[in-house]
């Protein structure tokens, strides 16, 4: 058996095509969605990610609002910029690009974001609403994973899912999404401290590798015909991206997401979706 590819690039392209039509319809009503980004410092990866997000905006017709700040920005200066986006009527939603410099408290900064404009779905308010099963912007990577699976015809209701990774951007919120009644999965949350990890992964229909531990899961640790989603991002000394699964899983699994080219494009597509979703809600109910 050679696994089929969970193609994030093609799926994200299809979603962006759908979003472009929705944005065009909004523009016909005089509504122009706007995505803002707050970028602090000169981290090359962060600059690359933000540039990609604004390219995506241009492709679907979303306006870009970019706020770039030096690495030594004070908390008060950052707070002023965030409050400015909260008040900006042209900004439908925005993100504060992480990581922030060490002198800036991340949770403090995220708490300043208007929860209704939280395009990443990662503010404490948004995550709290997710726990309570209340309407809120959904975290982009977990939402992208669910969308990637469903658009490839992977049956989620009743599936046993093993999520390996306990981070607040993927592992923890993904479990909340997958256990909603609309997905109805049974989720086991594991991590790098889990004893006998293979005992859990071998029982799973779907495994999400989100630990950021290269080669953590190999073919001996999965069942025949499993569905594997690789979210882990590590880099070799040569700078090559390496995921949480070893290459031999492709010969045993039914579906595997490539890394890169799997979840990454879906995350960016879901960021756009969160912005367009809010623009449509505002059009339906301006109050």
Swiss-Prot record:
Keywords annotated in UniProt: Amino-acid biosynthesis, Histidine biosynthesis, Hydrolase, Methionine biosynthesis, Multifunctional enzyme, NADP, One-carbon metabolism, Oxidoreductase, Purine biosynthesis
Q: Where NADP(+) is bound, by residue?
A: 165-167, 192, 233
An example Pfam family from this entry, by short name, is THF_DHG_CYH
Q: Which domain of life is it from?
A: Bacteria
Q: What does this protein do?
A: Catalyzes the oxidation of 5,10-methylenetetrahydrofolate to 5,10-methenyltetrahydrofolate and then the hydrolysis of 5,10-methenyltetrahydrofolate to 10-formyltetrahydrofolate.
Instruction: Indicate yes or no for the key word Amino-acid biosynthesis.
Output: yes
Task: Report quaternary structure and partners.
Answer: Homodimer.
The EC code for this enzyme is 1.5.1.5, 3.5.4.9
Q: What is this protein called?
A: Bifunctional protein FolD
Please tell me one Gene Ontology term that the record gives under cellular component. Answer: cytosol
For this chain, the family text in UniProt reads: Belongs to the tetrahydrofolate dehydrogenase/cyclohydrolase family.
Q: Which GO molecular function entries does the Swiss-Prot or TrEMBL record give?
A: methenyltetrahydrofolate cyclohydrolase activity; methylenetetrahydrofolate dehydrogenase (NADP+) activity
Respond yes or no to whether keyword Oxidoreductase is given for this record: yes
Q: Its annotated pathway? A: One-carbon metabolism; tetrahydrofolate interconversion
Its gene is folD
Q: Which reaction does it catalyse?
A: (6R)-5,10-methylene-5,6,7,8-tetrahydrofolate + NADP(+) = (6R)-5,10-methenyltetrahydrofolate + NADPH; (6R)-5,10-methenyltetrahydrofolate + H2O = (6R)-10-formyltetrahydrofolate + H(+)
Q: Which Gene3D superfamilies match?
A: Leucine Dehydrogenase, chain A, domain 1, NAD(P)-binding Rossmann-like Domain
InterPro entries assigned to the protein according to its UniProt record, in alphabetical order: Aminoacid_DH-like_N_sf, NAD(P)-bd_dom_sf, THF_DH/CycHdrlase, THF_DH/CycHdrlase_cat_dom, THF_DH/CycHdrlase_NAD-bd_dom
The GO annotation for biological process reads: L-histidine biosynthetic process; methionine biosynthetic process; purine nucleotide biosynthetic process; tetrahydrofolate interconversion
